[in-house]
């Protein structure tokens, strides 16, 4: 425990917060081009084929981003928008592709939570 005199002499050091999404460079979203679209398997105890894409961003980074929702239309050279947000059971995947923007179509026949998947309101 420092004395008040010691604190006057040199103040406490601020700890720098490390960002969880460095490729975004403090922006809410970033645009990028898919370099590879593939499936990968999650960590134990889960089992699935998760859809992911390798994306080259305008910030110069190349990152792995998750493609949420059922079915997608992405392929190599698709232009996508990514946001932060990791996928807990896929190591190294720290970004999500935003559905319904640029070349990414929204999820078809989606009725609940539509805004998260870029789906339009269904006709009554």
Swiss-Prot record:
Modified residues (3-methylthioaspartic acid): 89
Pfam families: Ribosom_S12_S23
GO-annotated molecular function: rRNA binding; structural constituent of ribosome; tRNA binding
Key words, A-Z: Methylation, Ribonucleoprotein, Ribosomal protein, RNA-binding, rRNA-binding, tRNA-binding
Compositional bias of kind Basic and acidic residues: 10-19
KW Isomerase (keyword) present: no
Chain positions covered by the region annotation Disordered: 8-28
GO biological process terms, semicolon-separated: translation
SUPFAM superfamilies listed in its UniProt record: Nucleic acid-binding proteins
Disulfide bonds: none
InterPro entries membership: NA-bd_OB-fold, Ribosomal_uS12, Ribosomal_uS12_bac
GO cellular component terms given for this protein: small ribosomal subunit
Stated role: With S4 and S5 plays an important role in translational accuracy.
Subunit structure: Part of the 30S ribosomal subunit. Contacts proteins S8 and S17. May interact with IF1 in the 30S initiation complex.
NCBIfam families, alphabetized: rpsL_bact (TIGR00981)
PANTHER family attached to this UniProt entry: 30S RIBOSOMAL PROTEIN S12 FAMILY MEMBER (PTHR11652)
Family: Belongs to the universal ribosomal protein uS12 family.
Name this polypeptide is given: Small ribosomal subunit protein uS12
Annotated source species: Arthrospira platensis (Spirulina platensis)
